[in-house]
């Protein structure tokens, strides 16, 4: 699942369920469906499974304070014979997404301690389109970030900087 998160800076939280947690990466530019793009994905702490459908406002001053949108949701399956834990330890996770927005084959490759690259693999779901701009709304509520902030008592002006112009 992917959450669009307007905290101190706009980023996308890319999360894969593994056991009893959501293994998570912060992707500053958001995912790209263009196989030519390599997106930085910074490993962050695991999150509880209950966070998968959180959409709302985290109060300013708390960790991650800002507006959160459920930008994409779906399932994934690993490609190959390795377990998730083994692929994570080796620093190369190859998987197929079946989300509302993101589909097809993807790879996460570790390039440093916490640094990974998120890449779309060439397949029929690949495209030369900015998916984040083309499909900016929540998959749960169809709201933009500013709408979520308005409805949940957050900073509408700050949240709106994460919405398309």
Predicted feature locations:
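A charge-rich, low-complexity, intrinsically flexible signal that marks solvent-exposed coils, linkers
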Residues: 1-165
């Amino acid at each position: 699942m992917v959450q669009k998160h307007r905290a101190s800076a706009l980023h996308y939280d890319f999360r894969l369920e593994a056991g009893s947690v959501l293994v998570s990466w912060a992707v500053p530019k958001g995912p790209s469906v263009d196989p030519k793009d390599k997106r930085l994905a910074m490993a962050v702490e695991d999150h509880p499974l209950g966070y998968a459908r959180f959409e709302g406002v985290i109060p300013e001053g708390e960790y991650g304070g800002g507006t959160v949108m459920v930008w994409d949701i779906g399932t994934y399956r690993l490609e190959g014979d390795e377990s998730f834990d083994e692929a994570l330890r080796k620093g190369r996770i190859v998987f197929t997404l079946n989300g509302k927005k993101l589909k097809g084959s993807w790879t996460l490759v570790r390039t440093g301690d916490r640094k990974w690259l998120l890449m779309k693999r060439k397949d029929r779901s690949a495209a030369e389109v900015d998916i984040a701009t083309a499909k900016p709304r929540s998959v749960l509520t169809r709201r933009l970030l500013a709408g979520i902030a308005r409805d949940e008592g957050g900073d509408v002006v700050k949240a709106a900087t994460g919405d398309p112009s």
